Amino acid sequence: MDFRIATSQDTPQVEALWAYCFEPKEDPFFQYYFSNCYEPENTLVGIQEGQLLSTVHLRQYNINVRGAILPTSYMVGVATHPAARRGGVGGALLLHSLEELRRRGQGITILMPSKAGFYQQYGWDLYAHQWVQTMPLESLRPLTDKTLSFGLLNDVEQWTLLDPVYKAYTKDLCGYAERGEKEWKRLLGSFFAEGVNIAVVKNDEGQIEGYAVYRLGAPEIPVTEFVYTTRRAQRGLLNYFYNHRSQGESIRWNEGLHDTGYRFVPDGKTGHTTMPYMMARIVDVETALTTVPVNLEAVMMPITLNIKVTDTLCDWNHGVFALSLGESTLPNVKRVSAESVDEIDITIDIGGLTVLLMGAVSAKDLVFEGKLQGESHWIDYLDMVYPKQNTYINEWW
């Protein structure tokens, strides 16, 4: 199978494969996506005997990792026609995608997995989970607050009302998507095209403290984005949904894993689960290590450590890299060997290095998981240089 970037002539076949594997052409999201958001220049296709049998859409995002804004491709619509499955096409598609992203100078890529195990074998690991709360609407009453007023949004130009709330919510988090006017309008446009609602809660000064994105029409009300700057804002939104008891039976909402409000829920024995949400993978080790900042307070003097990285998919990442710290928040990195050197301080697999940089897992925990090996003083040092973060992202496509 030959892989290349799509052209406009490929669009009918790209649409057909999406409709075969995901939403049908009549679906509102399909129509919105291919009318407003599809970019052939950011889509990789696999062609065999003139037939387009495999695709991945490389959605362009900027994600915030440890305070640095990194251009990133969010892989969505990873699809292979059943006629071409179980022949290694999926792995080849991912490899060619990584080669393309490396050519573009990107260091990290992300994707939302339908099955994490498929991608883990190729070096992806989960960096963001979410809480999923499900409960009968009647059970919301003890969690409500009546001090805030409600409002509804109905125009993409109202993105400016949501942006300050999102910025405040993500201020101390890691791995989230930066949203500007373009991203907000694209997002709100997709919501309104699909008949999705956006509710806000406001204080007496008219300042919006929180918002929720939700859909009606089924016994369970799904809330796919739940963002708030205060606990009373969350409770105010739950009060809003409590008023929907005649329009639904239960509610299900997602929230960041950093939120510890579950500790104060009167009855949390049921309906409280975690959802594996987003995976990440290093595209290029040198680029990733030189663009993700370190904790400068932990770097007291110049120091170099040799890190052996194992990557069974991308040979350019497999080898020993000299990581030099001490001059700034961004290290210097040089690949010193494709195989091994006499002195190796740390050995880590590509997935482990990814979640370490993303802040999802500490070096000590990676040792426990068997993804990192090294002397204890180097493990402690890594945890000072790359301290664990509260990770979050809520981009569905």
Q: Residue ranges of each PLM-predicted region?
A:
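Short amphipathic alpha-helix that is part of the acyltransferase structural core
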Residues: 1-60, 67-74, 141-183, 217-221
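Conserved acetyl-CoA pyrophosphate-binding loop and the N-cap/start of the following alpha-helix
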Residues: 84-96, 232-236
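Conserved active-site alpha-helix within GNAT-family acetyltransferase domains
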Residues: 103-107, 113-131, 236, 258-274
